[in-house]
């Protein structure tokens, strides 16, 4: 019994001396972090606080409003300047043509001597479009005639074994430069002569571009009938174009304000019109003589 009791005591003491728990792998520092986090806001709260401050700042709001206003004003200025130099509605007017108008206008350019009324027609102080008024200038015929002239020049150069992209490009650019120079000269002449009329840059560009029709007929006749045919066609188309330019420009430039003007101003208008007409044969010859040999 004693042995058993001693053994029991010894066993109980052995159980009370159990091995201590193993130390943790990481120290528990949650308490320290909790105290530190209490002093700093969360990341999301920082961003929200900055946005709220920006939106609530009157200086920032004023700057944003001013920037928006400046951008809107700049956009309006750009649109205004574009419409000042190139008006889409005005440009559409010069392309408002139909087949009947094109046929009649081409006949008028080739034989204008029997035409009587050269005044442009108006409806409620608005000029009628070209398809309703034969005397109204258009840009469709000059544009198509210029393209046809370039193609015809390429064919003529090819027949003469002188075709190259550089030469064809030089022909096209030279034809455009001459027309623009003529328009600038007319604008300067109208300004110096103090002519008050409804002629715009598009009107002058249309009248100046009608010479391409005579250039096409001259080159085509020269290719078919040689140099003799070329000079006959050149003389005919130049005379017809001169008559057309004199009658058209004189009627368009002589508005109601200029009819009762002084005699020197009327003489300047007449000289300007005659000078523009007399210049047409020289340009036609300069742009076409090298295409016919």
Swiss-Prot record:
Q: Which residues cross the membrane?
A: 139-159, 175-195, 204-226, 230-249, 272-292
Query: Cytoplasmic compartment: which residues?
Result: 2-138, 196-203, 250-271
- Residue positions, PTM N-acetylalanine: 2
- Recorded GO CC terms: endoplasmic reticulum membrane; endoplasmic reticulum-Golgi intermediate compartment membrane; Golgi membrane
The UniProt entry's GO biological process terms, in alphabetical order, are: endoplasmic reticulum to Golgi vesicle-mediated transport; protein transport
Which InterPro entries does the entry mention? Yif1_fam
Q: What is its main location?
A: endoplasmic reticulum
Q: Where is this region: Disordered?
A: 1-27
Bilayer topology reads: Multi-pass membrane protein
UniProt topological domain (Lumenal) ranges: 160-174, 227-229
Per UniProt, the keywords (alphabetical) are: Acetylation, Endoplasmic reticulum, ER-Golgi transport, Golgi apparatus, Membrane, Phosphoprotein, Protein transport, Transmembrane, Transmembrane helix, Transport
Localization per Swiss-Prot or TrEMBL: Endoplasmic reticulum membrane; Golgi apparatus membrane; Endoplasmic reticulum-Golgi intermediate compartment membrane
Matching entries from Pfam families are given as: YIF1
Location of Phosphoserine modifications: 12
**Keyword Plastid among UniProt keywords:** no
User: What's this protein's family per the entry?
Assistant: Belongs to the YIF1 family.
Fill in the subunit field for this protein. Interacts with YIPF5.
Summary of the function given for this chain in its UniProt record: Possible role in transport between endoplasmic reticulum and Golgi.
Its recorded name reads Protein YIF1A
Gene name, please? Answer: Yif1a
């Amino acid at each position: 019994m004693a042995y058993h009791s001693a053994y029991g005591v010894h066993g109980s003491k052995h159980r009370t001396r159990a091995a201590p728990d193993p130390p943790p792998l990481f120290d528990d520092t949650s308490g320290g972090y909790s105290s530190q986090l209490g002093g700093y806001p969360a990341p999301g709260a920082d961003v929200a606080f900055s946005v709220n401050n920006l939106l609530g700042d009157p200086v920032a709001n004023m700057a944003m409003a001013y920037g928006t206003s400046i951008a809107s004003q700049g956009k309006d200025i750009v649109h205004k300047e574009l419409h000042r130099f190139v008006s889409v509605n005005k440009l559409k007017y010069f392309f408002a043509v139909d087949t009947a108008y094109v046929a009649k206008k081409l006949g008028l350019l080739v034989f204008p001597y029997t035409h009587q009324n050269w005044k442009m027609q108006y409806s409620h102080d608005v000029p009628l479009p070209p398809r309703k008024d034969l005397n109204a200038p258009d840009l469709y015929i000059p544009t198509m005639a210029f393209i046809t002239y370039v193609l015809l020049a390429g064919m003529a150069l090819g027949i003469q074994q002188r075709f190259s992209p550089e030469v064809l490009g030089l022909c096209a650019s030279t034809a455009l430069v001459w027309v623009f120079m003529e328009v600038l000269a007319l604008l300067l002449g109208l300004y110096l002569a103090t002519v008050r009329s409804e002629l715009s840059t598009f009107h002058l560009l249309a009248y100046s571009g009608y010479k391409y029709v005579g250039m096409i007929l001259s080159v085509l006749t020269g290719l078919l009938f040689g140099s003799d045919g070329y000079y006959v066609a050149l003389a005919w188309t130049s005379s017809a174009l001169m008559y057309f330019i004199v009658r058209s420009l004189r009627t368009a430039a002589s508005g109601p304000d200029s009819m009762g003007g002084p005699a020197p101003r009327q003489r300047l208008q007449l000289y300007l019109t005659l000078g523009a007409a007399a210049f047409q044969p020289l340009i036609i010859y300069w742009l076409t003589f090298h295409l016919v040999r």
